[in-house]
């Protein structure tokens, strides 16, 4: 009987519960970078003396590449970045808040269809012919470069798949799969120069976004991780500021696809 009690006690000491076996009550934070792709978009501009739409506009992101700006607090908004803080409400589900700092740059010098009217047509090197014009910089520059800020809340599920790879100790190395959905506001700083007006570049709540994601999480030594995500979503901005006058505005909606890689930590308080 004494031997049995000793054996049981020894097994308890030798096989403590792993930190990675349960997630409920844990906090996490991560910081990383992203690349984006965007669908074509119709952009509607309106003001006191103009009201026109340009169709099937294409755009690209503006990556910084590998750079120390990702680590410089004074310059962290220059690259395309992701910041997220979350809390596990169960072993599998967590809620989080975050900012996806994307960048959106309209391609200039491309021929597009348009409709509507604006003053002094033909004087901005846009060469309007029929229902087409050229997106010359004298006519329009349009960027959400500081940035296309998606401030959002997500609910995500996390599942440990380490057993599929026969990993012996998840407290040393663990692989998780994660998926989630999100909703939030668009708070862009839109850099616009329109019809010869002064450039405008100020933060403004412009609309909303919806998103869904799937990703892989690689956790090392309990507390540190690398996370990769593929996130897609829909953005609808119906109140984009384009000049210092509140009479001037734009609206657009489009789909986006983000590729994210981030580093972070997970802990209990």
Regions found by a protein language model. Name each.
Residues 9-87, 188-190, 258-268:
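Short glycine/proline- and aromatic-enriched beta-strand/turn motifs that initiate or cap beta-hairpins
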Residues 15-17, 68-71, 137-143, 194-203, ...:
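Extracellular loop and loop/strand-boundary signature of outer-membrane beta-barrel proteins
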Residues 18, 22-25, 84-192, 264-267:
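Gram-negative (and chloroplast) outer-membrane scaffold detector with strong preference
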Residues 23-27, 77-81, 145-151, 173-175, ...:
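Residues that define the transmembrane beta-barrel architecture of outer-membrane proteins
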Residues 41-47, 108-114, 167-168, 188-198, ...:
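Outer-membrane beta-barrel translocator domains and adjoining extracellular loop/strand segments
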Residues 41-44, 50-51, 215, 219-269:
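Predominantly the C-terminal beta-signal and adjacent terminal strand-loop region
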Residues 57-66, 128-137, 189-197, 242-245:
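Flexible, solvent-exposed coil segments and beta strand-coil junctions
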Residues 83, 153-155, 210-214, 230, ...:
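Membrane-embedded beta-strands of outer-membrane beta-barrel proteins
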């Amino acid at each position: 009987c004494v031997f049995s009690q000793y054996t049981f006690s020894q097994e308890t000491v030798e096989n403590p519960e792993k930190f990675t076996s349960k997630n409920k009550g844990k906090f996490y934070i991560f910081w990383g970078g992203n690349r984006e792709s965007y669908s074509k978009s119709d952009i509607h501009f309106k003001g006191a003396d103009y009201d026109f739409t340009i169709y099937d506009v294409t755009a690209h992101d503006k990556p910084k590449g590998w750079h120390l700006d990702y680590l410089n607090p004074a310059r962290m908004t220059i690259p395309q970045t992701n910041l997220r803080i979350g809390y596990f409400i169960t072993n599998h589900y967590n809620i989080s808040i975050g900012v996806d700092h994307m960048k959106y740059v309209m391609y200039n010098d491309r021929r597009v269809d348009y409709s509507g009217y604006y003053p002094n047509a033909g004087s901005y090197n846009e060469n309007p012919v029929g229902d087409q014009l050229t997106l010359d910089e004298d006519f329009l520059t349009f960027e959400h470069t500081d940035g296309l800020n998606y401030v959002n809340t997500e609910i995500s599920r996390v599942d440990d798949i380490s057993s599929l790879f026969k990993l012996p100790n998840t407290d040393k190395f663990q692989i998780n799969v994660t998926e989630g959905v999100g909703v939030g506001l668009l708070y862009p700083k839109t850099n616009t120069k329109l019809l010869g007006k002064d450039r405008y570049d100020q933060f403004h709540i412009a609309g909303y976004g919806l998103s869904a994601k799937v990703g892989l999480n690689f956790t090392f030594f309990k507390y540190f991780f690398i996370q990769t995500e593929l996130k897609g979503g829909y953005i609808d901005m119906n109140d984009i500021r384009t000049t210092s006058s509140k009479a001037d505005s734009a609206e657009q909606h489009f789909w986006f696809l983000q590729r994210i890689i981030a580093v972070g930590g997970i802990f209990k308080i």
